[in-house]
Structures are given as C-alpha cells and as structure tokens.
Amino acid sequence: MEVVIVTGMSGAGKSASSHILEDLGYYTLDNMPPSLLLSFIDLTTKSKKKINKIACVVDIRGGEFFADLMKSITLLKNQSIDVKILYLDASDEILIRRYKEHRRPHPLAINGNISQGISNERELLSEVRNSADSIINTSNLTLGELRRKILYVFSLKDVDTKLAISVVSFGFKHGILLDADLVFDVRFLPNPYYIEELKKSSGLNTDIKDYVFGFDEANEFLDKLVDMVEFLIPKYSKEGKTNLVIGIGCTGGKHRSVAIAQALTARLEGNGEKVYVSHRDQKFW
C-alpha cells in the first residue's frame, strides 16, 4: 500500500493537490487527525475493497494532535507501508495575498495578524518539512503546473492523463445544460421536426443524420467545431483540466443536437480522443 501525507502551509495548495491525486486514482481524505491515521490505515488493509493508494491531507487544523503525525508515520513505515510526505509551501507574500483574496482567517492568526500566523505555522511545521520526501513551492505555479509537478514527483508518467470529453445533446426548451464547459446552439440548422415523415425519428436514426448533414452548413459547422475542440484540448490539459463537457443544443433535444453530438463524438474518437456521448433529454422522445 502507498500512503501519501499531504501537508504544509495553510494556503499553499494542499486541497488542490489532494484533488489532483484523487484524479490520479488515490483514495483521498481531507483534514485527517494524525491520531486516527494508524486506525484508518489498519481498517483499509482489512477492508474487502482493495485500496492500494491513499492520500491524506494533514495540517495544522489538527491542533495538538498534529504532534502525533511523525510518530504515526514512523509506525506505518515499521509496518512496511510505503509512506511519502508531500509538503506544500509558498512565500509569505503569496500566502498573505491568497488569504486576503479569499478573505479567510489564518488558523493561527492572533487578532487577524496573518503574518504572525504564518510565522507560527512555519515554526510548528519545521520538523515535518525537514522530513518531507518532496517539497513543492506553489508561489508561481498554475494548477496545470502543479499537476505536472505531482505527476513527476510520484513518477506517474504512465498514468492516463488524456482529457475525458463528454458530449451531451439537450433541448433548450427543457433548460440549458448547467454543467457544460462549452455550449453550442445548432438551432440555425433546418429542423426535421416539421417534416412529417421525420418527426418521430431521432438523431440516432439514419434518416435524420442524412437530413441534417444534407446541408452544407451542418458539415461546415462540424468541421469548424472539431478544429476548435482539438485546438482547445491541449490548452485545457495544460491548465490541469481532466474533464470537458460539451453541450450541443437544439429546440427539443431529439433531432439536430443528437445528430451533431453523434457526429462530433465519432470525429473526436477517430482522432484518438477519449469521448463519451449521451443525450440528456432522451426521456422526452
């Protein structure tokens, strides 16, 4: 079993690092009391559900229990468990700026004095920092750069980091797709709903596909859409994004949006992308 202890300065990116590790297959827990670490690992090893990689965020919020951390880590290592300490740090200036931007009190600040709180925290964390396997300074890192640092630190070069793309058709009359990163309105295309023999078919049927793509503007739109998505994929990946939801909307979510969503998925898959297609309003067909 591999256990990563994510710790470090408040505001340095422990939560973001935990989310990155979760995306990479780690079972993650936030604000784990050090005194419960041994018990949790013991329960995990005895569990029927096989968990091989765990990441626990342990920080100064643990109060007096934080002093138990190094003792717990030593005991885990004595059990032949692979324990690594990932320590997140940042300059005082950056930490102060982050706290002011988010308007949150530092856990060790006295009378709102952030600088003094940071100083107190550095002193309390000095032993853990000196024992860390890896220290990442996030002062000037974007989320994407932090992700790449973590991949490098834990030798996860073989992890599948390809952006997962979800293409979802929907009908505007049933509401916009709220969780979409990108939304495209295809109501500019002729609507097969008004052709009696096509009305009952859906965009999954050949007759609707043939009708929609019988218009030059549909083919031109698809070509431009594929080009744009392929342009954006590496940009999103660079910033650490792991999932991209693309919404394709028409009036009812049955004809045009479905045909375009299916065609977009096929084109992206043909380019080697990892794509999943779904049709939100299929229940209304």
UniProtKB/Swiss-Prot annotation:
It comes from the Bacteria. Transmembrane segments: none annotated. Displays ATPase and GTPase activities. This is Nucleotide-binding protein FMG_1084. Keywords: ATP-binding, GTP-binding, Nucleotide-binding. PANTHER family: RNASE ADAPTER PROTEIN RAPZ (PTHR30448:SF0). InterPro entries: P-loop_NTPase, RapZ-like, RapZ-like_N, RapZ_C. ATP binds at residues 8-15. GTP binds at residues 59-62. HAMAP family: RapZ_like (MF_00636). Pfam families: PapZ_C, RapZ-like_N. One of its GO terms (molecular function) is GTP binding. Belongs to the RapZ-like family.
